[in-house]
Amino acid sequence: MNLPILTRVYFVGYNIFVELCFNSRISDYVGYGKVGYNMAFSLKGIKLPHRKNTAGMSAVRMPAPKMVTLLTSMHVGKPAKPVVKVGDTVSVGTLIAEQDGMISSPVYSSVSGTVKSIADAVISNGKAVPAITIESDGNMTSDESIAAPQINNKEDFIEAVKKSGIVGLGGAGFPTYVKFATDKKIDTLVINGAECEPYITSDSVTMVDRADDILFAIETADRYFNFEKIVIGIEKNKSAAITKMKEIAVKNNKIKVVVLPSVYPQGGEKVLVYNTVGRVISAGKLPADVGCIVCNSSTMANIARYIKTGMPLVEKVITVDGGAVKEPKNVIAPIGTPVGDVFDFCGGFKCDPEKVLYGGPMMGIAVPDLSVPVLKQTNAILALDKKETNTSKTTACIRCGKCTNTCPFGLNPAGISKAYKNDDVEMLEKLGADICMLCGCCSFVCPAKRPLAETNVLAKNRLMAERAKKKEGNA
C-alpha cells in the first residue's frame, strides 16, 4: 500500500479497534458493558421522513362492523379470562373477559350483539390465546350498568384505571393501572406526545381534539399523587398539538410543555424521560425508579372518558395511511374490528399493498391477512406500496459502526448479531441484548442492509429463554 507511514499506522490501528469493537471485547468502554450502557440519548437517534399525511385530520367514526374479534391478550402480561359463553347477548361496555393476575387487563365488548365463538387465536409472539368473536346487531347499544366510578382517594383512582381496561395506547400495551399502583416515590408525571414514527398522527389528533380530557385526567391524577412536576413532551413537528397543550398548561401552572427535536425514537420511554426531565433510567429499571410515571396522551384522554362516564376502553383512534390506501384518515374504530373493514372505510386500496402493518414502519408488526382485528394498542394500520417497501440486497457487515452510533442506548447491534449467530449467550448477556428497545434505527442506517433489528428480537428472546431456564433449574 503506497501511503505515508503515519497514514498506514492510522489504518492499522483503526482496523484493530474496529475488530475489537466488533468482537465486543472492549464493551466495558464502548456502549453496553459491565459499567452500564451509553445514556447520551440527546445525541442519539435518526432523522426520518415524517410522512404525516393525516396531520390536521380529525378522527372520523366508522360504522359498526358486522363482526368483531376481541383477543384476551391485548396487553403485556397474562391474558384475561373469558366470562361469557357462546350465545350470550352483550352490549357496548359489557365485561367479556376479566383481569387474571396482577399484570393483566379486562376486555369489554366493543359492539352490541351475540357471542358467536370463543376459540384460540395466535398472537404476534406466536402464542395461542382465547379470542371472543361477537356478531354485531348494528345498534351499538351501551351496557345498562355503565356508570361513572366513585373516586375519593388514590386507591379508588387506581382501581378505576384498572377496571377501565386501559393499557399503554402508544403501542406498548402495558396495563396502565400498574404504573400508578407503584410503591415507589413518584414526583413527576410525563405525558408522551412525541409520536415519533412516520405516518402516525392518532396521538397528535387526540391532543388537539381532546385537550380538555387530557387536562382532566392530568388534574385528577395530580389530586391523588400531588406531583411536583407535570411535563408534556411533544416533537416540534406537531404545531397544532403544541398549541393545544400550551393552552391547557395556562390553566395549570404545574404543567410544562417541552418541545422536542423531531428525532426518532424520541417517544421511547427512557429517551423521553431523559430528554424532558433529565433523569437516567438504568438498565433493568422503570420510570418509577427515577420518580416518574409516563403515560401516552391518548391513554390520558381515555382515562378521562372512563372517569367521566364509566365507559371502558372499547374503541381506538387509529391512523390509516400508506401509499396503497385510497383515502388516508384518522378513524375511530371499535376494538376487534377486522383491519380490512377499516381499510374499506377509507376507500379501500388504490393498488395491491406490498405490506400491511400494525403500527409504524419502524416498530410495526406485519399483518398476515386483513381479517386480523384492531387491538387496544393499535395506533395505526399502514398499507404500504412497492415504493415504500423497496428493499436492497443484504451484504456483509463493513464494520462501519453506524448501528452503534445511532443506537439510543449505545448498544452494539453488529456484535449482538454475531453473538446470536454463534449462539454465544454469555456474550449476548454482556452486550445487553435484553436492553434493546427494538426501535429499528440500526437496520435503517446499516449500509449493508442487514436485518439487525430482526436479529435483535431473536437475540432478546434467546437470552430471556436462557435466563428462564436457569431460573427454573435453580428453583
Please provide the spans of the model-predicted regions:
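Short hydrophobic targeting helices and cationic amphipathic motifs
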Residues: 3-6, 11
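Hydrophobic alpha-helical positions that pack around
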Residues: 6, 227-339, 345-350
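N-terminal, Lys/Arg-enriched amphipathic/low-complexity engagement segments
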Residues: 31-83, 133
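Short, well-structured beta-strand-loop connectors
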Residues: 85-98, 117
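Conserved hydrophobic positions within beta-strands
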Residues: 113-115
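Acidic low-complexity segments
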Residues: 117, 122-179, 183-184, 239
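Gly-rich Lys/Arg/Thr-decorated short loops/hinges at beta-loop-alpha junctions or inter-strand turns
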Residues: 168, 189-203, 324
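Ferredoxin-type iron-sulfur electron-transfer modules in oxidoreductases and energy-metabolism complexes
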Residues: 378-394, 404, 408-475
